[in-house]
Amino acid sequence: MASASYHISNLLEKMTSSDKDFRFMATNDLMTELQKDSIKLDDDSERKVVKMILKLLEDKNGEVQNLAVKCLGPLVSKVKEYQVETIVDTLCTNMLSDKEQLRDISSIGLKTVIGELPPASSGSALAANVCKKITGRLTSAIAKQEDVSVQLEALDIMADMLSRQGGLLVNFHPSILTCLLPQLTSPRLAVRKRTIIALGHLVMSCGNIVFVDLIEHLLSELSKNDSMSTTRTYIQCIAAISRQAGHRIGEYLEKIIPLVVKFCNVDDDELREYCIQAFESFVRRCPKEVYPHVSTIINICLKYLTYDPNYNYDDEDEDENAMDADGGDDDDQGSDDEYSDDDDMSWKVRRAAAKCLDAVVSTRHEMLPEFYKTVSPALISRFKEREENVKADVFHAYLSLLKQTRPVQSWLCDPDAMEQGETPLTMLQSQVPNIVKALHKQMKEKSVKTRQCCFNMLTELVNVLPGALTQHIPVLVPGIIFSLNDKSSSSNLKIDALSCLYVILCNHSPQVFHPHVQALVPPVVACVGDPFYKITSEALLVTQQLVKVIRPLDQPSSFDATPYIKDLFTCTIKRLKAADIDQEVKERAISCMGQIICNLGDNLGSDLPNTLQIFLERLKNEITRLTTVKALTLIAGSPLKIDLRPVLGEGVPILASFLRKNQRALKLGTLSALDILIKNYSDSLTAAMIDAVLDELPPLISESDMHVSQMAISFLTTLAKVYPSSLSKISGSILNELIGLVRSPLLQGGALSAMLDFFQALVVTGTNNLGYMDLLRMLTGPVYSQSTALTHKQSYYSIAKCVAALTRACPKEGPAVVGQFIQDVKNSRSTDSIRLLALLSLGEVGHHIDLSGQLELKSVILEAFSSPSEEVKSAASYALGSISVGNLPEYLPFVLQEITSQPKRQYLLLHSLKEIISSASVVGLKPYVENIWALLLKHCECAEEGTRNVVAECLGKLTLIDPETLLPRLKGYLISGSSYARSSVVTAVKFTISDHPQPIDPLLKNCIGDFLKTLEDPDLNVRRVALVTFNSAAHNKPSLIRDLLDTVLPHLYNETKVRKELIREVEMGPFKHTVDDGLDIRKAAFECMYTLLDSCLDRLDIFEFLNHVEDGLKDHYDIKMLTFLMLVRLSTLCPSAVLQRLDRLVEPLRATCTTKVKANSVKQEFEKQDELKRSAMRAVAALLTIPEAEKSPLMSEFQSQISSNPELAAIFESIQKDSSSTNLESMDTS
């Protein structure tokens, strides 16, 4: 420390030198010292350093002054608080100095100090004291109005301080407001502007009293309307407040909007511009409160979008349909753009109107149909706007409209609505000719910006409506070529033009472009040769698509591609050979050449083998190998049967080596390539090549990556079909891995299907030691030997499916094996595991093969219904149902008879019936529907809930077989006197809803409202199942319930309330335990709310929704967990609404995070509380992603609390790490 002090005192001495270079060097060295974390200053050194730095702020040399200011930043964090106060005092005094240079440097110094203070959320005393000290001095400097430049600096610093530390200055907010309000009438506009900025920052942290004072003052002054100049300022101020604190100003809009509407009619363009900007901020920041006024705002914007009093457009509307490709008379185009009038401010009004319409379109999804009637035609008619900046905003507004129309939401392309013909998509379709007509002239404008807007517009239009431009390609192609050939085009314009052309080529049929290929190929080829790599890259994508257009392989085409092959090949091969080009260009050149060979390879002659050799080189390069593998896969799959023999000998071993690389995408791509090569080139592959591949397969077949396993198994299946002689190799490690995978509980879906296909392909090859019985022993051996017990039930199902697959492939082996399984079930010495496997295997085999010839099968299965093992009983139930599917006339009447005569076995038999209804063909079941229906209705009033649920599922699935007859019958049971019957039919409806279109859908849409009326049922359980059914509809097919939300939501929200009458106390020995019978129904209601966020957000009143979310935050553990998840979703879906409610949401979150578990609680209680805290913290982290959330005083206070509590701080930190790593993972595209 002594040496540091000595070094610093040395520097201080040099700072007093008369030589400015000495002073500069010493200050620079001091700066370096202060930036070191290790530096410790004693009191004396602190005092001297502070004094010297402040003195150097007045140095004659500007460079020394600037360095001294920079020293303030690190100095503030290294000295004691009273020294910081000295610095601040001196800077404030100097700010009022007569010397302009000293004032400026002191202002910069104050901003530097404020910037270095710890944020308000850290709860730092230093920050609070410094800010309080500065505030008093600033308010007096602002209020004096003596020197405008001092005022401007003071306002600047005040705004900076309020934005960073506003929450610490709550006590000063009234005095700050008092000094700021008079500045709104300052004769200097710059002062007014900075005052507005400061007020904007003030409203984000001030208390309600100050906020009300400010708004009342503005409203009162606006009502007086003393002068046009101040009225403009007040409107600007209101817009700024709305932008910064829309969630607070909302409740005053009823008073504000009529005033702003009135001022729109005043003949003052600047005032109009500010009024419309205010509307824009209301639309974006106060979505709920502005809703009643949206139509008024749209009408005002549409009026002023065309407001151009000094210009006449009439003469421009001559016939625009003739568009020449040569663009001969372009020189005199765009002369209108040069029209300029310095006094004409009307363009600002038009621009404000366009931006405001953009805001309306972007925030009001529910008004899309209305927008296409009114806003869309108006915007299209203004594409001819003469001011370039305004035109860009008109285009942007239309782009926003198109983006809102993207059919990501199921309701936008709801088939029912489509039939009515009035959906946003159909309305857009009808306006495409007008859009093209309006863009047509703009595409040859001189302005680069305008042409870029046109390309962005066309790209988005085609993304929203693929095929929309089919009729208009002849009009658009010349405009695209114009930009590609135009010497004045910027690189970005060419890239946009190419990107647009690519999207159009991808989304229209090839025939549409055939008349234009001759015109398109030369400019695209020229762009492939462009020196700028981004243009080359985009042009290669277009070339690849053009190749598919000139010779489509998936449809007959009479177009002659021959004249274009040489040009396309030559420009691509040049890029393929180049070594020093950009990575993206390398990859796209490979993909493009792959497409050329795939579609045109039979025309390449001697160029083909040479090009394939280049591919071989690219295959050996780590950077290009994955793209090359994909290109080879494309070529190998070509119907032209390209001759790949020259590269297979060297290529296949290289591909085999890729299977051991630690790159998942490469493994998957290579397996696809090898699969297609085996299918199409088996005669060119040698046994050695295939053996090399087989050697690499065992590590790929593993439950750790089911997708890779599935691809590997599919490859083996292809091998078994095409190259059976190679399979003798697999009996060792490959087969061991396969059998191991069959026993994995994770084997299901696509991987399981691939496994079944493989066993069927393998068993018919007749390979030694891999016959039917060999494979059967391998699969079932462990169960019979009991050497290794299979722990998971799923493993038995998988083995049984494999056994059935083998038996289907070898039907002659069937009877003997089935007989053996029957004996295994009968044998009293069989273990439960053997019985389980035997029953499941009988079920799987019987599903596909008629087993009615096995006379004792029925009695053996019924006997198994009495087994003491639940798993064996369940397997017997499944087996009976599955076997019945194989011969319905034999088994179905038997099952129905047993259900009637065996009440004790009813539950298991109903499960068998469910299996039959779920799996049998509709035609096969039709004759039995009436009998099954009658039987089910007898049991739908059963008191046992498990039985009722199976009956309901059977009823639902049966209804799908004959909806016209059965759905009305189900509906009839809604008036049953039995609450059990009502709950059964409502649950049955759940099983008629699926996420893909079905014949029942239109019928269901007409009557689902009747089933949902049971949300008003007096019985609690009926209401609960109604919510579960509603949730299923909202999740799988939202179009069924969208139009019912207005009537359903009040009942749904009603079920989120805690009901005291449903809470009771139960005595358990010496303890009293509280039971809440309403918990399950509340949970069901909150689950529905969560689902609605994803499927019907545009139909929700989000503020009403948030009221119930707030209640849920104070409810039971399960419901809190659900509402925390909702908050995370809401933070991204509707941040502005959440921001308005932030203060009310923070309190319950804080309560959860600070709750302590009683010391004598059980471990489970501690774990539950810990999980609650983590979930609450995730919600807090999500809320903090909303811009400006941390500026809420309550939120910043809660943040301070989190950071000062080690336990909460640790949880919060780990959650933030998790979310950032998740974001990184989602960016990993490989």
From Swiss-Prot:
Modified residues (Phosphoserine): S335, S558
Chain positions found as N6-acetyllysine: K55, K971
One annotated GO biological process: SCF complex assembly
Molecular function (Gene Ontology), one example: TBP-class protein binding
Assigned keywords, A-Z: Acetylation, Cytoplasm, Nucleus, Phosphoprotein, Repeat, Ubl conjugation pathway
Keyword Repeat tagged: yes
InterPro entries linked to this entry: ARM-like, ARM-type_fold, CAND1/CAND2, TATA-bd_TIP120
Induction of expression: Repressed by miR-148a.
Positions of the UniProt region annotated as Disordered: 315-344
Cellular component annotations (GO), alphabetically ordered: cullin-RING ubiquitin ligase complex; cytoplasm; cytosol; extracellular exosome; extracellular region; ficolin-1-rich granule lumen; Golgi apparatus; membrane
Subcellular location: Cytoplasm; Nucleus
N-acetylalanine: residues carrying this PTM: A2
Swiss-Prot/TrEMBL HEAT repeat ranges: 2-39, 44-81, 83-119, 131-165, 171-208, 210-247, 248-282, 289-366, 370-407, 424-467, 471-510, 515-552, 563-602, 606-643, 646-683, 688-725, 729-768, 770-808, 809-845, 852-889, 890-927, 928-960, 961-998, 1002-1039, 1043-1097, 1099-1133, 1140-1189
Oligomer status and interactors: Interacts with TBP. Part of a complex that contains CUL1 and RBX1. Interacts with unneddylated cullins: interacts with CUL1, CUL2, CUL3, CUL4A, CUL4B and CUL5. Does not bind neddylated CUL1. Interaction with cullins is abolished in presence of COMMD1, which antagonizes with CAND1 for interacting with cullins. Interacts with ERCC6. Interacts with DCUN1D1, DCUN1D2, DCUN1D3, DCUN1D4 and DCUN1D5; these interactions are bridged by cullins and strongly inhibits the neddylation of cullins.
Chain's role: Key assembly factor of SCF (SKP1-CUL1-F-box protein) E3 ubiquitin ligase complexes that promotes the exchange of the substrate-recognition F-box subunit in SCF complexes, thereby playing a key role in the cellular repertoire of SCF complexes. Acts as a F-box protein exchange factor. The exchange activity of CAND1 is coupled with cycles of neddylation conjugation: in the deneddylated state, cullin-binding CAND1 binds CUL1-RBX1, increasing dissociation of the SCF complex and promoting exchange of the F-box protein. Probably plays a similar role in other cullin-RING E3 ubiquitin ligase complexes.
Comment field (misc): A model has been proposed to explain the mechanisms of cullin-RING E3 ubiquitin ligase complexes assembly. According to this hypothesis, cullin-RING E3 ubiquitin ligase complexes exist in a 'stable' active state when saturated with substrate, occluding access to deneddylation by the COP9 signalosome (CSN) complex. The neddylation-conjugated cullin-RING E3 ubiquitin ligase complexes mediate ubiquitination of substrates and can recruit downstream factors involved in substrate degradation.
Similarity remark: Belongs to the CAND family.
UniProt protein name: Cullin-associated NEDD8-dissociated protein 1
Protein source organism: Homo sapiens (Human)
Gene name per UniProt: CAND1
